[in-house]
């Protein structure tokens, strides 16, 4: 029976079936996953649980999670005003760090774009920003919490470092894709560097810049919630930390999680639409 006559067959007689050979990186990744899975299995099998039953504890954790998701509410440790205020403080913190970061990143992004500055300056700025991006936001916040103390200052400064590094990369790559013909025409007409920037680059790339900035705002909100327990800046993340680690109230945890999730999903939907409209389909 000829295989080419089978329904859905897309090959004819004489064609070779293409096979994909595992490359070195894929083999290394598969081996790493296999080793980690084996170590995890060994650890679970040999761990000393004492008098705690693993499966019983797992069942209780599942029950707590179900309670948290199905019975959110307040238990007297916080008022609804406190929780909503913490949510708006988180949004304000994200907005502040995004605005300041965008201003700084705009200048550094211009200096990092190879079509607007020399290669040495661009290389140095991009290298420094790469190092800053490699350090997790939570670690930056912890560093500044030790350096300048707990509070909004440490949270803003820590979030700012990663925001600047992220936006410099996004802005500089957008600037480098500006129409070279327009830039060359402006330079040939005697335009200054700033005139080239504001007449040839910014008008073309302003939509992309705003889209990247809003995407970073969405990321900063999530980070602001996460760093609340570290910085103690009055954000909703700190209330979540208290509800989970100090008051041990599952219902309050559920309410706070739902509020954070609602805002995060809304921002994510808006960011995705902006990304598709101004960045992917540019």
Each language-model region and where it sits:
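Transmembrane alpha-helices and adjacent helix-loop boundaries
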Residues: 117-119, 134-140, 152, 208, ...
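C-terminal transmembrane helix and the adjacent membrane-cytosol boundary/short C-terminal tail
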Residues: 251-282
């Amino acid at each position: 029976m000829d295989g080419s006559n089978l329904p859905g067959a897309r090959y004819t007689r004489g064609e070779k079936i293409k096979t994909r050979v595992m490359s070195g990186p894929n083999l290394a990744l598969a081996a790493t996953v296999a080793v980690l899975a084996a170590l995890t299995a060994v650890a679970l099998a040999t761990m000393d649980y004492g008098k705690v039953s693993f499966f019983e504890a797992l069942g209780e954790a599942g029950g707590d999670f179900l309670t948290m998701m199905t019975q959110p509410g307040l238990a007297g440790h916080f008022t609804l005003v406190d929780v909503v205020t913490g949510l708006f403080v988180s949004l304000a913190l994200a907005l502040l760090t995004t605005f300041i970061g965008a201003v700084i990143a705009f200048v550094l992004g211009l200096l990092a774009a190879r079509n607007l500055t020399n290669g040495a300056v661009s290389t140095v700025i991009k290298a420094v920003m790469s190092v800053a991006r490699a350090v997790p936001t939570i670690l930056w916040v912890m560093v500044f919490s030790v350096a300048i103390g707990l509070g909004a200052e440490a949270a803003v400064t820590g979030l700012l470092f990663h925001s600047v590094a992220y936006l410099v990369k996004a802005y500089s790559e957008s600037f480098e894709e500006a129409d070279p013909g327009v830039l060359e025409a402006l330079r040939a007409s005697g335009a200054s560097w700033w005139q080239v920037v504001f007449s040839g680059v910014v008008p073309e790339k302003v939509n992309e810049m705003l889209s990247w900035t809003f995407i970073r705002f969405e990321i900063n909100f999530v980070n602001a919630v996460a760093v609340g327990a570290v910085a103690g800046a009055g954000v909703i993340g700190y209330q979540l930390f208290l509800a989970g680690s100090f008051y041990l109230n599952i219902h309050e945890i559920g309410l706070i999680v739902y509020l954070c999730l609602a805002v995060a999903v809304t921002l994510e939907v808006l960011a995705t639409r902006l990304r598709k409209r101004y960045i992917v389909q540019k």
